[in-house]
């Protein structure tokens, strides 16, 4: 394999832009820390960290395969490996299979419940890229796909799925819809021209309001989560930091400028990190 082809594969997997993997990783770590009520098992943690990066890469590959005919018409995506011809469709499918199989082999080291849950995760990861053609709610499907690691991680750590798992699942799904709507605001003008659907288009001039409501509900549910586990004051300070980050994001998107909407999206990485820190300190 030439260096140029290897670089194209690397870009196709978004390894040069790991923000998506990090946004998938942090909630997975939330689940592991809460399930363990402290530091999770090292082998489970390692499997899920590797699995997150492999599955996110697989998701990026199948997403670009699904969008290969439209990405060339979008300013932000026209230089991606598939629309630019650096990687063929056949090569992309082969890479997707390698990444997907590698992820599944990791899951096979976990307990039977985790293995069963993984099939739904694979299904969600596969269908999400195609949803933007059929519904204005593809961000909802991304929320489900990005949250599915939560029950999987919990099951791997404890072998059980208590109701609180699904509470955390909803927290992350709402947060994901909020930040991916910010992301969709970047491409809204291009998407309207080529017929791609998104919540940014659905919400229209109410986009900032809906994002704000989703962020407020996310924060409220995080507070309720802390009350359920009787977490200490340090946890609530981190929620306050997360709230301030959301306020900053609202400031960034106030004029719906592309670059600032993308900056707001990227800022969510810090939200995920802050909550991880809060949970680790609280359960330590």
UniProtKB/Swiss-Prot annotation:
By its UniProt entry, which InterPro entries does this protein fall under? HB_polyprenyltransferase-like, Prenyltransferase, UbiA_prenyltransferase, UbiA_sf
**Keyword Zinc-finger assigned:** no
Membrane association type: Multi-pass membrane protein
Name any one GO molecular function.
4-hydroxybenzoate polyprenyltransferase activity
Q: Name one Pfam family in it.
A: UbiA
Gene Ontology BP, a term: ubiquinone biosynthetic process
Keywords (A to Z) from UniProt: Cell inner membrane, Cell membrane, Magnesium, Membrane, Transferase, Transmembrane, Transmembrane helix, Ubiquinone biosynthesis
What is the main EC category here? transferase
Its pathway, per UniProt, is:
Cofactor biosynthesis; ubiquinone biosynthesis
Cofactors per UniProt?
Mg(2+)
| Gene3D superfamilies, per the entry | UbiA prenyltransferase (1.20.120.1780)
Its EC number(s): 2.5.1.39
Catalytic activity, per the record? all-trans-octaprenyl diphosphate + 4-hydroxybenzoate = 4-hydroxy-3-(all-trans-octaprenyl)benzoate + diphosphate
Cellular compartments per GO CC:
plasma membrane
Q: Where are the transmembrane segments?
A: 33-53, 93-113, 136-156, 159-179, 209-229, 231-248, 264-284
Q: What is its main location?
A: membrane
Locations listed in the record: Cell inner membrane
Protein's job: Catalyzes the prenylation of para-hydroxybenzoate (PHB) with an all-trans polyprenyl group. Mediates the second step in the final reaction sequence of ubiquinone-8 (UQ-8) biosynthesis, which is the condensation of the polyisoprenoid side chain with PHB, generating the first membrane-bound Q intermediate 3-octaprenyl-4-hydroxybenzoate.
**NCBIfam families according to UniProt:** ubiA_proteo (TIGR01474)
Q: Which family, according to UniProt?
A: Belongs to the UbiA prenyltransferase family.
Protein's UniProt name = 4-hydroxybenzoate octaprenyltransferase
Q: Which organism is it from?
A: Vibrio campbellii (strain ATCC BAA-1116)
Q: What does the organism's lineage look like at the top?
A: Bacteria, Pseudomonadati, Pseudomonadota, Gammaproteobacteria, Vibrionales
Coding gene?
A: ubiA
């Amino acid at each position: 394999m030439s260096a140029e082809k290897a670089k194209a594969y690397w870009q196709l997997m978004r390894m040069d832009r790991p923000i998506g993997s990090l946004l998938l990783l942090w909630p997975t770590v939330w689940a592991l820390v809460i399930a363990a009520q402290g530091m999770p098992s090292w082998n489970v943690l390692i499997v899920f960290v590797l699995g997150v990066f492999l599955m996110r890469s697989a998701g990026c590959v199948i997403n670009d395969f699904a969008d290969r005919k439209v990405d060339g018409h979008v300013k932000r995506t026209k230089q991606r490996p598939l629309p630019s011809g650096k990687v063929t469709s056949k090569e992309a499918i082969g890479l997707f299979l390698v990444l997907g199989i590698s992820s599944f082999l990791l899951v096979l080291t976990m307990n039977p419940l985790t293995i069963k849950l993984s099939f739904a995760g694979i299904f969600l990861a596969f269908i999400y890229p195609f949803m933007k053609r059929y519904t204005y709610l593809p961000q909802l499907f991304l929320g489900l796909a990005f949250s599915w690691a939560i029950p999987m991680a919990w099951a791997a750590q404890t072998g059980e799925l208590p109701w609180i798992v699904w509470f955390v699942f909803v927290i992350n799904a709402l947060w994901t819809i909020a930040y991916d709507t910010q992301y969709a605001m970047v491409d809204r003008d291009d998407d309207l021209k080529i017929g791609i659907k998104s919540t940014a288009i659905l919400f229209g001039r109410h986009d900032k309001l809906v994002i704000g409501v989703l962020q407020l509900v996310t924060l409220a549910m995080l507070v309720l989560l802390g009350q359920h586990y009787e977490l200490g004051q340090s946890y609530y300070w981190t929620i306050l930091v997360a709230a301030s980050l959301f306020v900053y994001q609202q400031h960034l998107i106030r004029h719906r400028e592309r670059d600032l909407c993308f900056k707001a999206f990227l800022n969510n990485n810090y939200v995920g990190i802050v909550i991880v820190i809060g949970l680790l300190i609280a359960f330590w």
